[in-house]
A protein has these predicted regions:
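Active-site-proximal beta-alpha core segment in soluble small-molecule metabolic enzymes
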Residues: 5, 10-13, 17-20, 27, ...
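Active-site anion/phosphate-binding pocket segments in diverse small-molecule metabolic enzymes
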Residues: 2-15, 19, 68-70, 88-90, ...
Length: 372
């Protein structure tokens, strides 16, 4: 534990939980390959640490940017496919092509530009055609897809290795999602292409309806043990714990104000612990005054006043056991019978768990737990 005590705030990643969640992916879509989505620093879990952990067990990695792809290429050993899920800017494309990175194509013009770059670099560009069936973000419109696809098939430096779409509401709307799946299947059948990877299902769709008829699924949040649906799935195991340390303990008199704006004033003598974490670390300022809590010695303790950039103040009056400067505090995770999830924090902050996790800043150290 000595190494952890040298840190002010840190995240611990549990490989066993990642593997458990990966096994669940394989059970719910047994015939599909798995693309682990590791964009946004692996949803706050640490990009390099997560890729090293999962590399031997998955078929592909999905990222959002060229920088993310270039970061993980040198550490990918068994897994050979990385795909940039977003649209690349024109000045990024040549680097992607030279490094054999799979890219998305959402228009005929984009395909033409990739084909030209492929010819210039004597490369066959591996592309995934994206069809917009209801997300309204990227992709061919359904009306243009078949006509444009026919022309793209003639491009000599384009290898259509994938076809995909994205579900905007697979966490709660089965009817619309089913409609998307049927439209996608119809377009694929009429396109006269036979891509290796057909992928539709994100985490929510994978949990609710499996592979959705694809040959690959794209789990993101569920890989990290968080349910993307309103109902918590007990099969998922959260892979992340966020901890910080106490850096001061004081007794404040009745009538003492705490933090900026004096939004909280003690109504009685209060034992207050100052914790070494703040919005500069990604702990949301929007949790101020919302009844957010941390866990100290297995007990929930409420945050007092506003979250500041580097510190929060917590009421520890209910803690009977001795506490000292340097003691660990749980921000997200479990201690004894108490636990705080990213979903709980998200609700109190008025946001979603995706934002809580991806908001954990780079100055928070990521540590892989050795729990073999």
């Amino acid at each position: 534990m000595a190494a952890s005590l040298a840190k002010r705030t840190w995240v611990e990643i549990n490989p066993k939980a990642l593997f458990n969640n990966l096994d669940l992916c394989k059970k719910i879509a047994p015939d599909a390959e798995i693309m682990a989505v590791v964009k946004a620093d692996a949803y706050g879990h640490g990009l390099i640490e997560t890729v090293k952990t999962l590399d031997a067990k998955i078929d592909a990695f999905g990222v959002a940017t060229l920088k993310e792809a270039m970061t993980i290429l040198p550490i990918m050993e068994r897994c050979k496919m990385v795909m940039i899920l977003g649209a690349l800017l024109p000045d990024e494309r040549e680097t992607a092509i030279k490094n054999n990175i799979n890219v998305t194509v959402s228009s005929l013009q984009e395909a033409q530009e990739y084909n030209d770059l492929g010819r210039t670099n004597n490369k066959e560009v591996k592309v995934h055609l994206i069809v917009d069936t209801g997300m309204g973000r990227l992709g061919f419109t359904e009306k243009k897809f078949l006509r444009d696809c026919e022309e793209i098939r003639s491009f000599k430096n384009i290898d259509i290795v994938g076809m995909a779409t994205h579900f905007p509401c697979s966490d709660h709307n089965d009817e619309f999602t089913d409609h998307q799946i049927e439209r996608f299947k119809s377009l694929l059948k009429s396109s006269n292409i036979d891509p290796k990877w057909i992928h539709l299902a994100n985490s929510a769709a994978s949990l609710r309806i499996g592979s959705s008829g694809g040959t690959m699924i794209r789990p993101g949040l569920m890989i990290y043990g968080i349910s993307p649906t309103e109902l918590n799935d007990p099969r998922l195991q959260p892979a992340l714990e966020w901890k910080a340390r106490i850096n001061q303990i004081r007794i404040l008199e009745e009538g003492s104000s705490i933090s900026y704006g004096r939004t909280f004033v003690t109504k009685k003598e209060t034992k207050v612990a100052t914790i070494a974490v703040g919005y500069g670390d990604g702990y949301p300022r929007s949790l101020s005054g919302q009844g957010a809590e941390v866990i100290v010695n297995g007990k929930r303790c409420e945050i007092l006043g506003r979250v500041t950039m580097d510190m929060i103040m917590v009421d520890v009056s209910s803690i009977d056991e001795p506490i000292e400067t340097g003691d660990e505090v749980i921000l997200i995770g479990k201690d004894g019978e108490e636990s705080i999830s990213s979903t709980e924090l998200a609700k109190k902050a008025g946001t979603i768990p995706w934002e809580i996790l991806t908001g954990i800043s780079p100055r928070v150290i990521r540590v892989i737990k050795n729990n073999r």
